[in-house]
Amino acid sequence: MKNKKLIRYTSRDFDSIKADLIDHAKRYYPNSYNDFREGSFGSLMFDSVAYVGDVLSFYLDYQVNESFLETSIEYDNVRRHAKRYGYDFYGRPSAFGILTFYVLVPAAASGLGPDPDYLVRIKTGTKVSATTGATFMLTEDVDFSDPKNEVVVARVNETTGRPTFYAVRGTGQVKSGTLFRTNVNIGSFERFKRIRVGPSSINEIISVYDSEGHRYYQVDYLSQNTIFMEVTNKNSANDGVRSIIKPFVAARRFVIEQDSTGTYMVFGFGSDDEASLNINVADPSSAAIKLTGKNYITDRAFDPTKLLDTNKLGVAPQNTTLTIVYGANDADQINVPSNAINSVKELVYEFPDDSRISSALVRSVINSIEVTNDKRVVGNTATPSTDEIRIRSYGAYASQNRTVTREDYESYVYLMPPKFGSIKRASVINDPSSSNRRLSLYVASVDNSGNLVLANDTLKQNTKTWLNANKMLNDSIDIYDPYIINIGFTFYVSVDSSYDKQSVLNNCFSSLSTMFAEKMYIGEPLYISKIYKELNKVDGVIDAQNVVFNVKNTANYASSPISLQELVSNDGTYLNTPKNAILELKFPNLDIRGVAK
Protein backbone atom coordinates (compact mmCIF):
# COMPACT_ATOMS: atom_id res chain seq x y z
CA MET A 1 0.00 0.00 0.00
CA LYS A 2 2.97 2.34 0.53
CA ASN A 3 3.55 2.52 -3.26
CA LYS A 4 -0.05 3.51 -4.02
CA LYS A 5 -0.09 6.84 -5.85
CA LEU A 6 -2.35 9.67 -4.74
CA ILE A 7 -5.10 10.42 -7.27
CA ARG A 8 -7.70 13.19 -6.88
CA TYR A 9 -10.96 11.89 -8.30
CA THR A 10 -12.78 15.18 -7.68
CA SER A 11 -10.99 17.06 -10.47
CA ARG A 12 -13.43 17.47 -13.34
CA ASP A 13 -12.64 20.52 -15.49
CA PHE A 14 -9.72 21.23 -17.82
CA ASP A 15 -7.68 23.44 -15.47
CA SER A 16 -7.98 21.23 -12.38
CA ILE A 17 -7.18 18.04 -14.34
CA LYS A 18 -4.10 19.64 -15.92
CA ALA A 19 -2.92 20.98 -12.56
CA ASP A 20 -3.27 17.51 -11.02
CA LEU A 21 -1.33 15.93 -13.90
CA ILE A 22 1.55 18.38 -13.50
CA ASP A 23 1.56 17.87 -9.73
CA HIS A 24 1.52 14.10 -10.28
CA ALA A 25 4.55 14.31 -12.61
CA LYS A 26 6.50 16.53 -10.23
CA ARG A 27 5.74 14.31 -7.26
CA TYR A 28 6.37 10.86 -8.72
CA TYR A 29 8.68 11.53 -11.70
CA PRO A 30 10.92 14.43 -10.63
CA ASN A 31 14.01 13.01 -12.35
CA SER A 32 12.30 11.70 -15.48
CA TYR A 33 10.56 14.86 -16.62
CA ASN A 34 10.81 18.47 -15.49
CA ASP A 35 10.04 20.56 -18.60
CA PHE A 36 6.69 22.19 -17.87
CA ARG A 37 6.92 25.13 -20.27
CA GLU A 38 3.76 26.07 -22.25
CA GLY A 39 5.35 25.25 -25.61
CA SER A 40 6.94 21.95 -24.61
CA PHE A 41 5.90 18.48 -25.74
CA GLY A 42 4.96 17.62 -22.15
CA SER A 43 2.57 20.54 -22.04
CA LEU A 44 0.92 19.19 -25.21
CA MET A 45 0.41 15.81 -23.56
CA PHE A 46 -0.96 17.39 -20.38
CA ASP A 47 -3.35 19.53 -22.42
CA SER A 48 -4.52 16.55 -24.49
CA VAL A 49 -5.26 14.39 -21.46
CA ALA A 50 -6.97 17.28 -19.65
CA TYR A 51 -9.02 18.00 -22.79
CA VAL A 52 -10.24 14.40 -22.95
CA GLY A 53 -10.99 14.40 -19.23
CA ASP A 54 -12.96 17.64 -19.49
CA VAL A 55 -15.04 16.27 -22.38
CA LEU A 56 -15.76 13.04 -20.51
CA SER A 57 -16.76 14.99 -17.40
CA PHE A 58 -19.12 17.14 -19.43
CA TYR A 59 -20.60 14.09 -21.14
CA LEU A 60 -21.11 12.38 -17.77
CA ASP A 61 -22.78 15.47 -16.30
CA TYR A 62 -24.96 15.84 -19.36
CA GLN A 63 -26.13 12.23 -19.30
CA VAL A 64 -26.85 12.38 -15.58
CA ASN A 65 -28.96 15.50 -16.10
CA GLU A 66 -30.82 13.76 -18.93
CA SER A 67 -31.81 11.04 -16.47
CA PHE A 68 -34.20 13.35 -14.63
CA LEU A 69 -37.29 15.17 -15.83
CA GLU A 70 -36.37 18.40 -14.03
CA THR A 71 -32.98 18.76 -15.74
CA SER A 72 -33.49 17.07 -19.13
CA ILE A 73 -32.88 19.18 -22.22
CA GLU A 74 -33.35 16.82 -25.15
CA TYR A 75 -36.97 16.75 -26.29
CA ASP A 76 -37.24 12.97 -26.67
CA ASN A 77 -35.83 12.41 -23.18
CA VAL A 78 -38.28 14.88 -21.64
CA ARG A 79 -41.03 13.08 -23.49
CA ARG A 80 -39.95 9.66 -22.14
CA HIS A 81 -39.81 10.95 -18.56
CA ALA A 82 -43.26 12.53 -18.95
CA LYS A 83 -44.69 9.23 -20.16
CA ARG A 84 -43.40 7.58 -17.01
CA TYR A 85 -45.36 10.19 -15.06
CA GLY A 86 -48.53 9.35 -16.98
CA TYR A 87 -48.47 12.19 -19.52
CA ASP A 88 -48.24 10.94 -23.08
CA PHE A 89 -49.03 12.49 -26.42
CA TYR A 90 -48.33 11.48 -29.98
CA GLY A 91 -49.04 12.74 -33.44
CA ARG A 92 -50.29 16.08 -34.61
CA PRO A 93 -53.84 16.48 -33.27
CA SER A 94 -56.77 16.47 -35.67
CA ALA A 95 -58.93 19.50 -36.33
CA PHE A 96 -62.70 19.11 -36.14
CA GLY A 97 -65.60 21.06 -37.61
CA ILE A 98 -69.08 20.98 -39.08
CA LEU A 99 -69.52 21.18 -42.86
CA THR A 100 -72.59 22.19 -44.81
CA PHE A 101 -73.43 20.19 -47.94
CA TYR A 102 -75.79 21.30 -50.70
CA VAL A 103 -77.31 19.15 -53.44
CA LEU A 104 -79.80 19.68 -56.27
CA VAL A 105 -82.47 16.96 -56.30
CA PRO A 106 -85.05 16.55 -59.10
CA ALA A 107 -88.62 17.25 -58.11
CA ALA A 108 -91.12 14.47 -57.53
CA ALA A 109 -93.64 13.69 -60.26
CA SER A 110 -96.23 15.81 -58.47
CA GLY A 111 -93.80 18.71 -58.23
CA LEU A 112 -94.32 18.88 -54.47
CA GLY A 113 -90.96 18.31 -52.84
CA PRO A 114 -87.84 16.49 -54.03
CA ASP A 115 -88.02 12.96 -55.43
CA PRO A 116 -87.17 10.69 -52.44
CA ASP A 117 -85.42 8.19 -54.75
CA TYR A 118 -82.71 10.79 -55.47
CA LEU A 119 -82.10 11.94 -51.91
CA VAL A 120 -78.51 10.75 -51.76
CA ARG A 121 -76.69 9.74 -48.59
CA ILE A 122 -73.06 10.92 -48.37
CA LYS A 123 -71.22 8.21 -46.46
CA THR A 124 -68.61 8.31 -43.74
CA GLY A 125 -65.12 8.41 -45.26
CA THR A 126 -65.92 11.02 -47.91
CA LYS A 127 -62.94 13.33 -48.32
CA VAL A 128 -63.07 17.09 -48.91
CA SER A 129 -60.23 19.56 -49.35
CA ALA A 130 -59.52 23.12 -48.25
CA THR A 131 -57.78 25.99 -49.99
CA THR A 132 -54.75 25.34 -47.76
CA GLY A 133 -54.35 21.88 -49.31
CA ALA A 134 -55.48 20.03 -46.18
CA THR A 135 -57.76 17.01 -46.50
CA PHE A 136 -60.76 16.44 -44.22
CA MET A 137 -62.73 13.24 -43.80
CA LEU A 138 -66.42 12.88 -42.99
CA THR A 139 -66.94 11.07 -39.68
CA GLU A 140 -70.72 10.61 -39.99
CA ASP A 141 -73.24 10.10 -42.79
CA VAL A 142 -75.01 13.09 -44.30
CA ASP A 143 -78.53 11.90 -45.10
CA PHE A 144 -80.38 14.32 -47.38
CA SER A 145 -83.65 12.46 -46.69
CA ASP A 146 -83.61 13.67 -43.09
CA PRO A 147 -86.80 15.71 -42.56
CA LYS A 148 -84.81 18.22 -40.49
CA ASN A 149 -82.87 19.32 -43.59
CA GLU A 150 -83.70 22.66 -45.15
CA VAL A 151 -85.34 22.35 -48.59
CA VAL A 152 -85.95 25.24 -51.03
CA VAL A 153 -87.01 25.46 -54.67
CA ALA A 154 -83.93 25.82 -56.87
CA ARG A 155 -85.29 25.68 -60.45
CA VAL A 156 -88.73 26.00 -62.01
CA ASN A 157 -90.24 25.25 -65.41
CA GLU A 158 -90.48 28.62 -67.18
CA THR A 159 -93.65 27.55 -68.96
CA THR A 160 -95.67 25.93 -66.18
CA GLY A 161 -93.98 27.50 -63.17
CA ARG A 162 -93.71 24.11 -61.47
CA PRO A 163 -90.52 23.30 -59.54
CA THR A 164 -88.09 21.02 -61.39
CA PHE A 165 -85.25 20.90 -58.85
CA TYR A 166 -84.99 21.43 -55.12
CA ALA A 167 -81.89 22.45 -53.18
CA VAL A 168 -81.38 20.42 -50.01
CA ARG A 169 -79.04 21.46 -47.21
CA GLY A 170 -77.40 18.92 -44.86
CA THR A 171 -74.60 19.02 -42.29
CA GLY A 172 -71.95 16.58 -41.13
CA GLN A 173 -68.88 16.44 -38.91
CA VAL A 174 -65.38 16.18 -40.35
CA LYS A 175 -61.89 15.67 -38.98
CA SER A 176 -58.61 16.59 -40.59
CA GLY A 177 -56.33 14.04 -42.17
CA THR A 178 -56.73 10.89 -44.13
CA LEU A 179 -56.20 7.15 -43.73
CA PHE A 180 -53.03 5.33 -44.71
CA ARG A 181 -52.41 1.60 -45.06
CA THR A 182 -49.10 -0.17 -44.59
CA ASN A 183 -47.99 -3.81 -44.48
CA VAL A 184 -45.26 -4.98 -42.11
CA ASN A 185 -43.68 -8.42 -42.47
CA ILE A 186 -43.07 -10.18 -39.14
CA GLY A 187 -40.41 -12.88 -38.88
CA SER A 188 -39.74 -15.39 -36.14
CA PHE A 189 -40.84 -15.00 -32.54
CA GLU A 190 -39.23 -12.19 -30.58
CA ARG A 191 -39.92 -11.04 -27.04
CA PHE A 192 -41.39 -7.54 -26.90
CA LYS A 193 -41.35 -7.18 -30.66
CA ARG A 194 -41.00 -3.52 -31.70
CA ILE A 195 -41.91 -2.48 -35.24
CA ARG A 196 -41.96 0.88 -36.97
CA VAL A 197 -45.36 1.88 -38.34
CA GLY A 198 -44.63 5.25 -39.91
CA PRO A 199 -43.65 8.87 -39.19
CA SER A 200 -44.12 10.66 -35.89
CA SER A 201 -47.10 12.61 -37.29
CA ILE A 202 -49.46 9.61 -36.86
CA ASN A 203 -52.28 10.53 -34.48
CA GLU A 204 -54.41 7.36 -34.50
CA ILE A 205 -54.06 3.64 -35.15
CA ILE A 206 -57.35 2.58 -36.74
CA SER A 207 -56.90 -1.18 -37.08
CA VAL A 208 -54.25 -3.91 -37.06
CA TYR A 209 -54.84 -7.37 -38.60
CA ASP A 210 -52.45 -10.22 -39.31
CA SER A 211 -52.52 -12.57 -42.30
CA GLU A 212 -54.74 -15.04 -40.44
CA GLY A 213 -57.39 -12.40 -39.78
CA HIS A 214 -56.62 -11.88 -36.09
CA ARG A 215 -57.11 -8.35 -34.83
CA TYR A 216 -54.71 -6.59 -32.47
CA TYR A 217 -55.96 -3.92 -30.07
CA GLN A 218 -54.21 -0.85 -28.74
CA VAL A 219 -53.97 -0.55 -24.95
CA ASP A 220 -52.34 1.95 -22.60
CA TYR A 221 -49.92 -0.64 -21.22
CA LEU A 222 -49.29 -4.29 -22.03
CA SER A 223 -50.51 -5.61 -18.67
CA GLN A 224 -53.93 -4.16 -19.52
CA ASN A 225 -55.80 -7.01 -21.17
CA THR A 226 -59.35 -5.65 -21.12
CA ILE A 227 -60.80 -3.10 -23.52
CA PHE A 228 -64.31 -1.76 -23.85
CA MET A 229 -65.97 -2.23 -27.22
CA GLU A 230 -68.97 -0.46 -28.70
CA VAL A 231 -71.86 -2.81 -29.51
CA THR A 232 -74.95 -1.69 -31.40
CA ASN A 233 -77.99 -1.41 -29.15
CA LYS A 234 -80.92 -3.14 -30.87
CA ASN A 235 -83.33 -1.43 -28.49
CA SER A 236 -82.06 2.07 -29.27
CA ALA A 237 -85.46 3.18 -30.56
CA ASN A 238 -86.98 2.69 -27.11
CA ASP A 239 -84.25 3.72 -24.69
CA GLY A 240 -82.49 6.32 -26.87
CA VAL A 241 -79.03 4.75 -26.39
CA ARG A 242 -77.31 4.07 -29.71
CA SER A 243 -74.56 1.78 -28.42
CA ILE A 244 -73.71 -0.43 -25.46
CA ILE A 245 -70.20 -0.59 -24.01
CA LYS A 246 -69.06 -4.12 -23.15
CA PRO A 247 -65.74 -5.39 -21.73
CA PHE A 248 -63.70 -7.59 -24.04
CA VAL A 249 -60.50 -9.53 -23.40
CA ALA A 250 -57.79 -8.44 -25.83
CA ALA A 251 -55.25 -11.27 -25.86
CA ARG A 252 -53.60 -9.72 -28.92
CA ARG A 253 -52.62 -6.21 -27.97
CA PHE A 254 -49.94 -3.60 -28.38
CA VAL A 255 -48.84 -0.23 -27.08
CA ILE A 256 -47.71 2.78 -29.06
CA GLU A 257 -44.34 4.46 -28.63
CA GLN A 258 -43.49 7.61 -30.50
CA ASP A 259 -40.50 9.92 -30.74
CA SER A 260 -38.92 12.20 -33.31
CA THR A 261 -37.80 9.20 -35.41
CA GLY A 262 -41.25 7.69 -35.94
CA THR A 263 -44.19 5.76 -34.49
CA TYR A 264 -43.64 2.24 -33.15
CA MET A 265 -45.79 -0.67 -31.97
CA VAL A 266 -44.60 -2.88 -29.10
CA PHE A 267 -46.08 -6.34 -28.42
CA GLY A 268 -45.81 -8.76 -25.50
CA PHE A 269 -44.25 -12.23 -25.54
CA GLY A 270 -47.22 -14.59 -25.23
CA SER A 271 -48.03 -17.47 -27.57
CA ASP A 272 -51.26 -18.40 -29.31
CA ASP A 273 -52.20 -20.46 -26.23
CA GLU A 274 -53.09 -17.23 -24.48
CA ALA A 275 -55.48 -16.31 -27.29
CA SER A 276 -57.12 -19.75 -27.25
CA LEU A 277 -58.74 -19.30 -23.86
CA ASN A 278 -62.08 -18.69 -25.61
CA ILE A 279 -62.97 -15.82 -23.33
CA ASN A 280 -65.16 -13.35 -25.19
CA VAL A 281 -66.35 -11.29 -22.27
CA ALA A 282 -64.12 -10.50 -19.32
CA ASP A 283 -65.12 -12.13 -16.05
CA PRO A 284 -64.10 -10.16 -12.93
CA SER A 285 -64.20 -13.35 -10.86
CA SER A 286 -61.06 -14.54 -12.63
CA ALA A 287 -59.19 -11.69 -10.98
CA ALA A 288 -60.44 -12.40 -7.44
CA ILE A 289 -57.89 -12.11 -4.68
CA LYS A 290 -56.38 -15.48 -3.83
CA LEU A 291 -55.63 -16.15 -0.16
CA THR A 292 -53.24 -18.99 0.63
CA GLY A 293 -51.87 -19.88 4.06
CA LYS A 294 -52.72 -16.63 5.85
CA ASN A 295 -55.65 -15.49 7.95
CA TYR A 296 -55.61 -11.83 6.94
CA ILE A 297 -56.34 -9.80 3.82
CA THR A 298 -53.84 -7.38 2.35
CA ASP A 299 -55.41 -4.20 0.99
CA ARG A 300 -54.94 -4.58 -2.75
CA ALA A 301 -56.30 -2.17 -5.35
CA PHE A 302 -58.44 -3.88 -7.98
CA ASP A 303 -57.53 -3.00 -11.55
CA PRO A 304 -60.61 -3.36 -13.80
CA THR A 305 -58.39 -3.38 -16.87
CA LYS A 306 -56.62 -6.60 -15.84
CA LEU A 307 -59.09 -9.47 -15.83
CA LEU A 308 -57.08 -12.24 -17.49
CA ASP A 309 -54.87 -14.53 -15.43
CA THR A 310 -51.69 -14.39 -17.51
CA ASN A 311 -48.30 -12.76 -17.25
CA LYS A 312 -47.29 -12.95 -20.91
CA LEU A 313 -48.43 -9.37 -21.64
CA GLY A 314 -50.23 -10.32 -24.83
CA VAL A 315 -49.67 -12.48 -27.89
CA ALA A 316 -46.66 -11.58 -30.01
CA PRO A 317 -47.12 -11.93 -33.79
CA GLN A 318 -44.75 -14.26 -35.62
CA ASN A 319 -44.26 -15.40 -39.24
CA THR A 320 -47.11 -13.25 -40.53
CA THR A 321 -47.86 -9.92 -42.18
CA LEU A 322 -49.55 -7.13 -40.27
CA THR A 323 -51.90 -4.84 -42.17
CA ILE A 324 -52.02 -1.53 -40.32
CA VAL A 325 -54.43 1.32 -41.04
CA TYR A 326 -53.59 4.62 -39.37
CA GLY A 327 -54.71 8.22 -39.54
CA ALA A 328 -52.51 11.28 -39.98
CA ASN A 329 -52.74 14.84 -41.20
CA ASP A 330 -51.55 15.35 -44.76
CA ALA A 331 -50.85 19.09 -44.46
CA ASP A 332 -49.29 21.49 -41.97
CA GLN A 333 -52.11 24.03 -42.00
CA ILE A 334 -55.22 22.14 -40.89
CA ASN A 335 -56.85 24.87 -38.78
CA VAL A 336 -58.80 26.65 -41.51
CA PRO A 337 -61.02 29.76 -41.44
CA SER A 338 -64.67 29.78 -42.46
CA ASN A 339 -65.53 29.11 -46.12
CA ALA A 340 -62.08 27.61 -46.76
CA ILE A 341 -63.33 24.06 -47.44
CA ASN A 342 -64.92 24.20 -50.87
CA SER A 343 -64.36 21.02 -52.88
CA VAL A 344 -65.19 17.33 -52.69
CA LYS A 345 -62.04 15.26 -53.16
CA GLU A 346 -63.36 11.71 -52.89
CA LEU A 347 -67.10 11.04 -52.67
CA VAL A 348 -68.61 7.94 -51.06
CA TYR A 349 -72.38 7.81 -51.52
CA GLU A 350 -75.45 5.64 -51.90
CA PHE A 351 -79.07 6.06 -53.06
CA PRO A 352 -82.14 4.48 -51.41
CA ASP A 353 -82.81 2.10 -54.35
CA ASP A 354 -80.49 1.87 -57.36
CA SER A 355 -83.11 0.00 -59.39
CA ARG A 356 -85.47 2.97 -59.43
CA ILE A 357 -83.17 5.78 -60.52
CA SER A 358 -81.83 7.10 -63.81
CA SER A 359 -78.07 7.14 -64.39
CA ALA A 360 -78.31 10.56 -66.06
CA LEU A 361 -80.11 12.08 -63.08
CA VAL A 362 -77.68 10.36 -60.71
CA ARG A 363 -74.77 12.09 -62.46
CA SER A 364 -76.67 15.37 -62.25
CA VAL A 365 -77.25 14.96 -58.52
CA ILE A 366 -73.65 13.94 -57.80
CA ASN A 367 -72.19 16.78 -59.88
CA SER A 368 -74.35 19.31 -58.05
CA ILE A 369 -72.96 18.52 -54.59
CA GLU A 370 -71.23 21.50 -53.00
CA VAL A 371 -69.59 21.89 -49.62
CA THR A 372 -68.47 24.71 -47.34
CA ASN A 373 -67.67 25.37 -43.69
CA ASP A 374 -69.71 28.15 -42.13
CA LYS A 375 -67.45 28.22 -39.06
CA ARG A 376 -63.70 27.80 -38.67
CA VAL A 377 -62.29 24.30 -38.26
CA VAL A 378 -59.89 24.11 -35.32
CA GLY A 379 -58.38 21.54 -32.99
CA ASN A 380 -54.71 21.35 -33.91
CA THR A 381 -52.16 23.01 -31.64
CA ALA A 382 -48.41 23.41 -31.77
CA THR A 383 -46.25 20.71 -30.25
CA PRO A 384 -45.85 21.46 -26.52
CA SER A 385 -42.48 22.79 -25.43
CA THR A 386 -40.28 20.96 -22.94
CA ASP A 387 -41.39 23.28 -20.14
CA GLU A 388 -45.07 22.64 -20.96
CA ILE A 389 -44.46 18.88 -20.97
CA ARG A 390 -42.84 19.07 -17.52
CA ILE A 391 -45.73 21.04 -16.02
CA ARG A 392 -48.39 18.81 -17.58
CA SER A 393 -46.61 15.61 -16.55
CA TYR A 394 -46.65 16.66 -12.90
CA GLY A 395 -50.39 17.21 -13.16
CA ALA A 396 -50.92 13.87 -14.90
CA TYR A 397 -48.93 12.06 -12.22
CA ALA A 398 -51.01 13.63 -9.45
CA SER A 399 -54.34 12.95 -11.16
CA GLN A 400 -53.73 9.16 -11.44
CA ASN A 401 -56.34 8.68 -14.19
CA ARG A 402 -59.14 10.29 -12.20
CA THR A 403 -60.52 13.82 -12.11
CA VAL A 404 -61.23 15.17 -8.64
CA THR A 405 -59.39 18.44 -8.19
CA ARG A 406 -59.23 21.47 -10.44
CA GLU A 407 -55.72 20.53 -11.53
CA ASP A 408 -56.90 17.00 -12.37
CA TYR A 409 -59.47 18.31 -14.82
CA GLU A 410 -57.03 20.66 -16.52
CA SER A 411 -54.39 17.94 -16.78
CA TYR A 412 -56.90 15.48 -18.22
CA VAL A 413 -57.96 17.98 -20.90
CA TYR A 414 -54.37 18.16 -22.10
CA LEU A 415 -54.21 14.34 -22.10
CA MET A 416 -57.04 14.07 -24.64
CA PRO A 417 -55.98 11.78 -27.54
CA PRO A 418 -54.99 13.67 -30.70
CA LYS A 419 -57.69 11.96 -32.74
CA PHE A 420 -60.24 14.02 -30.76
CA GLY A 421 -58.45 17.33 -31.33
CA SER A 422 -56.34 19.44 -29.03
CA ILE A 423 -56.97 22.27 -26.57
CA LYS A 424 -54.31 24.97 -26.28
CA ARG A 425 -55.41 26.44 -22.96
CA ALA A 426 -57.89 25.18 -20.35
CA SER A 427 -59.02 26.43 -16.96
CA VAL A 428 -61.56 25.05 -14.48
CA ILE A 429 -63.37 27.18 -11.90
CA ASN A 430 -66.16 26.37 -9.48
CA ASP A 431 -69.48 28.01 -10.20
CA PRO A 432 -70.20 29.99 -6.99
CA SER A 433 -73.89 30.28 -7.87
CA SER A 434 -74.34 26.51 -8.18
CA SER A 435 -75.46 24.17 -5.42
CA ASN A 436 -75.01 20.91 -7.37
CA ARG A 437 -71.22 20.79 -7.90
CA ARG A 438 -71.24 22.37 -11.34
CA LEU A 439 -67.83 23.13 -12.81
CA SER A 440 -67.09 25.70 -15.47
CA LEU A 441 -64.40 24.69 -17.95
CA TYR A 442 -63.01 27.41 -20.21
CA VAL A 443 -61.12 26.24 -23.29
CA ALA A 444 -59.34 28.01 -26.15
CA SER A 445 -57.71 26.75 -29.32
CA VAL A 446 -55.38 28.32 -31.90
CA ASP A 447 -55.50 29.01 -35.63
CA ASN A 448 -52.86 28.25 -38.25
CA SER A 449 -50.83 31.30 -37.21
CA GLY A 450 -50.78 30.20 -33.58
CA ASN A 451 -53.18 32.94 -32.46
CA LEU A 452 -55.88 32.19 -29.92
CA VAL A 453 -59.39 31.45 -31.23
CA LEU A 454 -62.56 30.09 -29.69
CA ALA A 455 -62.96 26.31 -29.84
CA ASN A 456 -65.83 25.12 -32.01
CA ASP A 457 -68.77 23.08 -30.72
CA THR A 458 -67.38 19.78 -32.00
CA LEU A 459 -64.11 20.20 -30.14
CA LYS A 460 -66.00 21.13 -26.97
CA GLN A 461 -68.21 18.06 -27.28
CA ASN A 462 -65.16 15.83 -27.76
CA THR A 463 -63.61 17.37 -24.66
CA LYS A 464 -66.74 16.77 -22.60
CA THR A 465 -66.99 13.16 -23.78
CA TRP A 466 -63.34 12.61 -22.88
CA LEU A 467 -63.79 14.05 -19.38
CA ASN A 468 -66.96 12.07 -18.70
CA ALA A 469 -64.96 8.83 -18.73
CA ASN A 470 -63.08 9.67 -15.52
CA LYS A 471 -65.02 12.42 -13.74
CA MET A 472 -66.83 11.90 -10.46
CA LEU A 473 -70.45 10.82 -10.85
CA ASN A 474 -71.91 13.87 -9.13
CA ASP A 475 -69.74 16.42 -10.96
CA SER A 476 -71.37 18.41 -13.76
CA ILE A 477 -69.22 20.15 -16.35
CA ASP A 478 -70.17 23.16 -18.46
CA ILE A 479 -67.72 24.17 -21.20
CA TYR A 480 -67.50 27.85 -22.12
CA ASP A 481 -65.49 30.17 -24.33
CA PRO A 482 -63.17 32.55 -22.48
CA TYR A 483 -62.93 36.21 -23.38
CA ILE A 484 -59.84 36.70 -25.55
CA ILE A 485 -58.40 40.12 -24.69
CA ASN A 486 -55.89 41.36 -27.26
CA ILE A 487 -53.54 43.86 -25.72
CA GLY A 488 -50.74 46.12 -26.89
CA PHE A 489 -48.38 48.52 -25.17
CA THR A 490 -45.88 51.31 -25.71
CA PHE A 491 -42.64 51.36 -23.72
CA TYR A 492 -40.35 54.29 -23.02
CA VAL A 493 -36.64 53.69 -22.35
CA SER A 494 -33.57 55.83 -21.73
CA VAL A 495 -30.70 54.83 -24.02
CA ASP A 496 -26.99 55.28 -23.41
CA SER A 497 -25.65 58.01 -25.70
CA SER A 498 -22.87 55.70 -26.91
CA TYR A 499 -25.43 53.29 -28.42
CA ASP A 500 -27.49 53.65 -31.58
CA LYS A 501 -31.09 54.23 -30.47
CA GLN A 502 -32.66 52.34 -33.36
CA SER A 503 -30.49 49.28 -32.73
CA VAL A 504 -31.37 49.33 -29.04
CA LEU A 505 -35.09 49.61 -29.88
CA ASN A 506 -34.81 46.67 -32.27
CA ASN A 507 -33.19 44.59 -29.54
CA CYS A 508 -35.98 45.62 -27.15
CA PHE A 509 -38.61 44.55 -29.69
CA SER A 510 -36.87 41.20 -30.20
CA SER A 511 -36.58 40.54 -26.47
CA LEU A 512 -40.23 41.40 -25.78
CA SER A 513 -41.47 39.34 -28.74
CA THR A 514 -39.62 36.32 -27.36
CA MET A 515 -41.13 36.98 -23.94
CA PHE A 516 -44.68 36.90 -25.33
CA ALA A 517 -44.09 34.05 -27.81
CA GLU A 518 -45.62 31.52 -25.41
CA LYS A 519 -49.36 32.01 -25.00
CA MET A 520 -50.55 33.00 -21.55
CA TYR A 521 -52.96 30.91 -19.51
CA ILE A 522 -56.62 31.59 -18.85
CA GLY A 523 -56.92 33.87 -15.83
CA GLU A 524 -53.15 34.48 -15.68
CA PRO A 525 -52.28 38.06 -14.63
CA LEU A 526 -49.59 40.05 -16.42
CA TYR A 527 -47.09 41.69 -14.09
CA ILE A 528 -45.75 44.88 -15.63
CA SER A 529 -42.50 44.50 -13.69
CA LYS A 530 -41.61 41.56 -15.97
CA ILE A 531 -41.61 43.93 -18.96
CA TYR A 532 -39.44 46.45 -17.08
CA LYS A 533 -37.02 43.67 -16.14
CA GLU A 534 -36.82 42.41 -19.73
CA LEU A 535 -36.16 45.91 -21.08
CA ASN A 536 -33.48 46.67 -18.50
CA LYS A 537 -31.56 43.55 -19.55
CA VAL A 538 -31.08 44.89 -23.09
CA ASP A 539 -27.61 46.31 -23.78
CA GLY A 540 -27.72 50.09 -24.10
CA VAL A 541 -30.84 50.60 -21.99
CA ILE A 542 -30.12 52.79 -18.98
CA ASP A 543 -33.62 52.55 -17.55
CA ALA A 544 -37.12 51.49 -18.57
CA GLN A 545 -39.18 54.57 -17.69
CA ASN A 546 -42.78 53.66 -18.47
CA VAL A 547 -45.09 51.10 -20.07
CA VAL A 548 -48.54 52.17 -21.31
CA PHE A 549 -51.08 49.46 -22.19
CA ASN A 550 -54.06 49.50 -24.53
CA VAL A 551 -56.79 47.00 -25.49
CA LYS A 552 -57.18 46.13 -29.18
CA ASN A 553 -60.80 45.93 -30.38
CA THR A 554 -60.45 46.81 -34.07
CA ALA A 555 -60.62 44.52 -37.11
CA ASN A 556 -58.48 41.34 -36.97
CA TYR A 557 -58.67 41.37 -33.18
CA ALA A 558 -61.00 39.55 -30.80
CA SER A 559 -64.00 41.48 -29.56
CA SER A 560 -64.05 41.72 -25.77
CA PRO A 561 -66.35 43.71 -23.47
CA ILE A 562 -63.57 44.10 -20.88
CA SER A 563 -61.93 47.53 -20.83
CA LEU A 564 -58.39 48.48 -19.84
CA GLN A 565 -59.66 50.20 -16.68
CA GLU A 566 -61.13 46.88 -15.52
CA LEU A 567 -57.81 45.11 -16.04
CA VAL A 568 -55.35 47.47 -14.36
CA SER A 569 -54.88 46.79 -10.65
CA ASN A 570 -55.43 49.51 -8.06
CA ASP A 571 -51.69 50.05 -7.61
CA GLY A 572 -51.06 49.87 -11.38
CA THR A 573 -48.44 47.12 -11.11
CA TYR A 574 -50.22 44.34 -13.02
CA LEU A 575 -53.13 43.51 -15.30
CA ASN A 576 -55.68 41.54 -13.28
CA THR A 577 -57.11 39.07 -15.80
CA PRO A 578 -60.61 37.75 -14.97
CA LYS A 579 -60.88 34.01 -14.39
CA ASN A 580 -62.90 33.63 -17.60
CA ALA A 581 -60.51 35.61 -19.83
CA ILE A 582 -57.08 35.24 -21.38
CA LEU A 583 -54.61 37.92 -22.45
CA GLU A 584 -52.90 37.73 -25.83
CA LEU A 585 -50.35 39.86 -27.62
CA LYS A 586 -51.57 38.84 -31.07
CA PHE A 587 -49.25 40.71 -33.46
CA PRO A 588 -45.98 41.61 -31.68
CA ASN A 589 -44.69 43.61 -34.66
CA LEU A 590 -47.78 45.83 -34.55
CA ASP A 591 -48.84 45.73 -30.92
CA ILE A 592 -45.49 46.66 -29.36
CA ARG A 593 -44.36 50.26 -29.75
CA GLY A 594 -41.20 51.79 -28.33
CA VAL A 595 -39.79 55.25 -27.70
CA ALA A 596 -36.09 55.81 -27.01
CA LYS A 597 -34.95 58.92 -25.17
Language model features by range: what are they?
Residues 1-597:
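Signature of Asx- and small-polar-rich beta-strand/turn repeats characteristic
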